Amino acid sequence: DETVINILKQNNVELIAMRCAGYNNVDLTAADKAGIKIVRVPAYSPNAVAEHAVAILLALTRHIPQAYLRTKTGNFTLTGLTGRNLNGLTAGILGTGKIGQIMAELLAGFGMKIILYDLYPNKFWATQHNFEYVPLEDLFKKK
């Protein structure tokens, strides 16, 4: 925020290098006013981000956190731990930039049907992968 930017300026900071893709957590107006340049990594490992999202999806659909906590306490029962198969389910991808495209391709590898929404659709890419762009309302309605 502006207070932090001003403290940095008082300490002769001229540049803030962000280890992320976006600027959403920096007061750009305050930084500009203080003469501090902001730089970022615009392609911050889109594969790692998409793969991490898939790992979280798998952990949740397979109840891995719950299974881990149970086994830690010596409880090896399977009740309530039966997971769901991703194969045959529909995945809705909101935004088909680099991360969204990689995520869609990874999930398609599990046999999921992929539907997409983006203000600026990449229809050529979607057609290549047999993915379908749908209106935003439909993305949230599909099961």
At which residue positions do the language-model features occur?
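Generic structural signal for helix capping and beta-alpha/helix-loop junctions
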Residues: N25-V26, A48, G74, Q101, ...
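Phosphate/diphosphate ligand-binding glycine-rich loop within oxidoreductases
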Residues: D1-Y68, G83
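A short, charged, Gly/Pro-tolerant segment at domain boundaries
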Residues: R70-L78
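Residue-level detector of flexible, active-site-proximal loop/helix-junction positions
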Residues: Y23, S45, T71, P121, ...
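Rossmann-like dinucleotide/phosphate-binding beta-alpha-beta segment
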Residues: T79-K143
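Conserved hydrophobic/aromatic pocket- or pore-lining residues that grip, position, or stack substrates
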Residues: A31, A53, G74, G95, ...
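Alpha-helix boundary recognition
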Residues: K9, D32, K72, N87, ...
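Generic structural signal for alpha-helix termini and adjacent loop/cap motifs
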Residues: L60-H63, G74, K142
